[in-house]
Design a protein with these regions (language model features):
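Accessory carbohydrate-recognition regions in carbohydrate-active enzymes
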Residues: 1-316, 320-396, 401-427
Length: 427
C-alpha cells in the first residue's frame, strides 16, 4: 500500500494506492494500481483496517470501493482476486511509477508492463517487467492521465489477475508466470505457499509457552525470512553492473540491510539454512566484484548499494558464517574486497564515496573526530541536516568490523602483517 497523509505509513487510515510488486524492503513499490467499484475516474477510497494477513495469503476489504482484494504469492508471481460487491461499473486502474519510460499495456486479457525501481537518492535504477492475464475479458481499455483504466462487465462480480515479474525481460516474466501460476486457482496457489511456509517454519519446534507466545515466536521467525531475496531467474540474475550473469549453481540474493541483520538474522540463517547463507555471502562477493569501485556493499538492493546507516558489517556476517561451517562462498575473494573497501571507501554515515579527511584522521589516530561546540560542519559528504558525523557510533562500529576482519583473515591464513592494522583499530 501507499498511504495518504504526511506519515505515509500504517498510522494513516486511508490508502492512496496499491502496488503489484515491491522490489525492496519498506519501499513503496512499482506498478501502482487500485480497484474501483464505481466511477473509475473518481479518487480511490479505501482503508486497510479490515485486513487478514498470513505468510501464504492476504486479503483486505476496501470499504470505500466495496471491493475485497485477496492475493496469494508464488516465488516470482502472484494471483490477485477482486470481489466487487456493488453492481455497476467495475475497473482496475494501473500506472507506472516512472512517468518517462514506464508503461502498462492491456490487449485482450493480457497485461504487459515496464516500470523502473529507484532509490531515494536517485543513483540506483533497475527495470522491472511484468506480465499478466485476466480471467475475464475486459470491456474496454483506455488511457486517462497517465493511467491505464481496464473496465470489466458490470455483471462480473469477481475478476482474477495472475502476474509475474522479472528484472531481466518481459519474456522471462511470461515464462515465470506460465511455470508458477498457469491458471486462476487461488486455493492451489495459497495452498502451495502454505505448504512451503509450514515446512520452513516447522524446522524449529518449540515446547511450552502460551498460544500467544508461540504466535509471537513464529511471527518473528517468519519475518527473518523477509530478507535477503533470491532474484535468480532460470539460472541468471541482474548484477550490480546492470548486466545479466549466469548464477553458476549459486543463487543470487539482494535486498539486505546489514546494519539490521548482521547481529541475529544472518547468524540464525547460517544455522537453519547454511547452503542459502553461503549463497548470500557469495552474492555479496559478486556485488563487490561487479560495482565500479570494487567496494563491498552494506545495503544491497537489486541495482546497487543504498549505503544507509553507519559502518560496514558484512565482515562480521562472513566471519560468523565461516565459523559455523559455511564454506560455499569465495571467502578469500571476500576478504580482498573487504580489505580494499576499508582502505578506499569513507566511513561517513549514509555516504558512499571516497575517503575524506575524517577517514584519514581515523586511520592515524584510531577514532573518528567530532566537532567542537558550535563548530560548523565543513567536510563534504557529511549530512548536515540529520545524520551528521556520529563519531562515537562510527568509532565503535569500526572497531567491531576491524576485529572481525582480523579474525576472518586468520581463519583464512592471511599473512599476519596484513592484519596488524585491523588488530590496532579493534583495540
Amino acid at each position: 500500500f501507499r498511504f495518504n497523509g504526511p506519515a505515509g505509513s500504517f498510522v494513516e487510515d486511508r490508502v492512496r494506492t496499491c502496488h503489484l510488486f515491491v522490489p525492496g524492503h519498506r519501499d513503496p513499490g512499482v506498478f501502482p494500481f487500485h480497484p474501483k467499484g464505481g466511477d473509475a475516474d473518481a479518487p480511490f477510497r479505501g482503508t486497510w483496517d479490515q485486513e487478514h494477513a498470513t505468510p501464504y495469503s492476504y486479503d483486505v476489504y476496501l470499504d470505500g470501493e466495496a471491493v475485497r482484494m485477496s492475493v496469494a504469492p508464488g516465488e516470482k508471481a502472484g494471483l490477485f482476486v477482486f470481489d466487487f460487491e456493488r453492481p455497476g461499473p467495475h475497473a482496475l486502474v494501473f500506472s507506472a511509477k516512472d512517468r518517462v519510460r514506464g508503461r502498462v499495456t492491456v490487449r485482450g486479457r493480457e497485461l504487459d508492463g515496464l516500470d523502473v525501481y529507484g532509490n531515494y537518492r536517485g543513483d540506483i535504477r533497475a527495470d522491472v517487467f511484468v506480465r499478466g492475464s485476466f480471467d475475464v475479458e475486459p470491456t474496454g481499455v483506455r488511457m486517462a492521465g497517465g493511467r491505464t483504466v481496464v473496465s470489466f462487465p458490470e455483471e462480473s462480480c469477481t475478476v482474477r489477475l495472475r502476474v509475474a515479474f522479472s528484472y531481466l525481460s518481459s519474456g522471462q516474466a511470461a515464462r515465470s508466470l506460465a511455470a508458477e501460476i498457469p491458471d486462476f486457482d487461488f486455493a492451489r496457489v495459497a495452498g502451495g505457499a502454505r505448504e512451503v511456509w509450514n515446512r520452513t517454519l516447522g524446522q524449529v519446534a518449540v515446547e511450552g509457552g502460551t498460544d500467544d507466545a508461540r504466535a509471537v515466536f513464529y511471527t518473528a521467525l517468519w519475518r527473518t525470512y523477509e530478507r535477503m531475496v533470491n532474484v535468480t531467474e532460470e539460472g541468471r540474475y541482474r548484477g550490480f553492473d546492470g548486466k545479466v550473469h549466469d548464477a553458476d549453481g549459486s543463487d543470487y540474493y539482494v535486498d539486505d540491510w546489514s546494519w539490521d541483520t548482521y547481529r541475529a538474522a544472518h547468524p540464525l540463517m547460517a544455522i537453519l539454512r547454511p547452503k542459502e547463507e553461503g549463497d548470500k555471502m557469495q552474492s555479496y562477493v559478486r556485488m563487490g566484484e561487479q560495482n565500479r569501485e570494487g567496494w563491498m556493499p552494506v545495503f544491497p538492493c537489486i541495482a546497487g548499494d543504498r549505503h544507509s546507516m553507519v559502518n560496514r558489517h558484512p565482515s562480521v556476517m562472513m566471519l560468523d558464517a565461516w565459523r559455523k561451517g559455511v564454506r560455499n562462498f569465495d571467502a578469500k575473494r571476500a576478504f580482498e574486497i573487504i580489505d580494499h573497501t576499508e582502505e578506499t571507501e569513507s566511513l561517513v554515515p549514509w555516504y558512499r564515496g571516497p575517503l575524506t579527511e575524517l577517514d584519514v584522521f581515523y586511520k592515524a589516530h584510531g577514532y573518528y573526530p567530532g566537532l567542537r561546540t558550535n563548530e560548523t560542519e565543513w567536510v563534504e559528504g557529511v549530512d548536515r541536516r540529520w545524520e551528521h558525523r556520529q563519531c562515537v557510533s562510527v568509532t565503535q562500529g569500526a572497531a567491531l568490523d576491524a576485529w572481525a576482519i582480523a579474525e576472518f583473515g586468520r581463519e583464512l591464513g592471511i599473512d599476519a602483517a596484513r592484519l596488524e592494522k585491523y588488530d590496532a583499530r579493534a583495540k
